[in-house]
Amino acid sequence: MKLLTACITPFLPNYEIDFLSFERILYSQKKEGNGVVLLGSTGESLALTVKEKESLVAFACSLKLQIPIVVGVSGTSLNDALEWMKICHAYPIDGFLIPSPIYTKPGVYGQTLWFESLLNTTDKPVILYNIPSRAGTPLYLETVGALASHPSCYGVKDSGGSIERCREYAQIAPHLVVYCGDDSLWPQMHSYGAQGLISVLSNSWPREARSYVDNPYQESNTLLWQELSLWLSLTTNPIAIKAVLAYKQDIAHSVLRLPLSIADLQNAEALPNVVEKMLKWSQIYPVHT
């Protein structure tokens, strides 16, 4: 699972899930052999009911994509998280992505017990998620060290913005797979021990993302990738990537659920230029398949 796409959840104008657009996104990833992460922050999981989340997992599994399907587990209630994992076990998913519980800001001991409680309920591979900007606390090195030998602990996704922290995760648990969780930092994190990328940008450009993950040090590619990644990061995710997908007609609508709004898109006037540059990627820099 070298490249996983952190999938959006597309919505119709009435805020219901747009399964037709969702299917297009999933098949575009299948075509390139990319795995998918459903119901992370990019998928607006906290804005969905349990029933809606299950419907997305069930739909994705029904397509028999034959690519890795990883499901996000978020929230603050341990019982709710355990119940959600139990629901997911009824489907042929391939793993879980689990952040530190949001809002509560646990210390090392509490965070470790939280993850251990969830790891003990599954034999699926689990990726621990460092996302301090949303969780309020980092994924502590001590937590990773304590859980690294657990049979269900598979990897770490690092979206903390620190290349040094990526190196520390790789050192403290060398047998775990470290994923870069920030598109713009992929080359640097790869050189510091990251073995894969969980990408937002690949929602719209799955083939180009696959090429870049496989060849992260080509300077011309890096400059373009950085420019696009930084534009996406100007706005809270997934606002910008939904704007791109709708502009390209990969999804029918750029609708988000509150408190997110497409009206908050930053530097919106650059959108046509962003899309045009990526359309030229394969012409300028051949994609390796």
UniProtKB/Swiss-Prot annotation:
Subcellular location: Cytoplasm
Gene Ontology CC: cytosol
EC number: 4.3.3.7
GO molecular function: 4-hydroxy-tetrahydrodipicolinate synthase activity
InterPro entries, alphabetized: Aldolase_TIM (IPR013785), DapA (IPR005263), DapA-like (IPR002220), Schiff_base-form_aldolases_AS (IPR020625), Schiff_base-form_aldolases_CS (IPR020624)
PROSITE patterns, per database record: DHDPS_1 (PS00665), DHDPS_2 (PS00666)
Catalytic reaction(s) noted: L-aspartate 4-semialdehyde + pyruvate = (2S,4S)-4-hydroxy-2,3,4,5-tetrahydrodipicolinate + H2O + H(+)
Active-site residues, Swiss-Prot/TrEMBL: 129, 157
Function: Catalyzes the condensation of (S)-aspartate-beta-semialdehyde [(S)-ASA] and pyruvate to 4-hydroxy-tetrahydrodipicolinate (HTPA).
Family classification: Belongs to the DapA family.
Subunit structure: Homotetramer; dimer of dimers.
HAMAP family: DapA
Protein name stated in the entry: 4-hydroxy-tetrahydrodipicolinate synthase
Gene name in the database record: dapA
